[in-house]
Structures are given as structure tokens and as C-alpha cells.
Amino acid sequence: MTMRVSADRTVCVGAGLCALTAPGVFDQDDDGIVTVLTAEPAADDDRRTAREAGHLCPSGAVRVVEDTE
């Protein structure tokens, strides 16, 4: 299963939940806007926390897509 993580920086409100929840996958720039550190997380823990961050993001900027192939 492949996971792809992306973030729409134009809708990010800088809440920081992504970086706090999944620090191995997300960070924030100097303005507090999300940055993706790992677009295809492989570690189980990073995948789990990326999913959680996607659910917690208040603006919907974080997107997590999983392929079953």
C-alpha cells in the first residue's frame, strides 16, 4: 500500500496540528504555513500520524491518499 501526503499551502491557517501530530511528515515554515517533509511516508508510525493529521487539520489543507495496489 502506497501513501501520498500533500498540503495546500493556500488554505493552511497555521494551526500547527499537522506538525504536532506528525512531526516526521509535516513541519511549518517561518510564517506557520505547513510544509511536507515526507511525501510518501514509509514508516508505520509516520503513516498512522499522517492519517491522524489529515483528520485533524481544521482547514482541510492536509490531504492523505492511500492506494491499495
Swiss-Prot record:
Textual note on the cofactor: Binds 1 [3Fe-4S] cluster.
Induction: By herbicides.
UniProtKB keywords: 3Fe-4S, Electron transport, Iron, Iron-sulfur, Metal-binding, Transport
UniProt-listed Pfam families: Fer4_19
Disulfide pattern: none
One Gene Ontology MF term: iron ion binding
Binding, [3Fe-4S] cluster: C12, C18, C57
InterPro entries documented for this protein: 3Fe4S_ferredoxin (IPR001080), Divergent_4Fe-4S_mono-cluster (IPR010693), Fe-S_cluster_ET (IPR051269)
UniProt cofactor(s): [3Fe-4S] cluster
PANTHER family cross-referenced by the UniProt entry: FERREDOXIN (PTHR36923:SF3)
Role description: Electron transport protein for the cytochrome P-450-SU1 system.
Designated name of the protein: Ferredoxin-1
Organism: Streptomyces griseolus
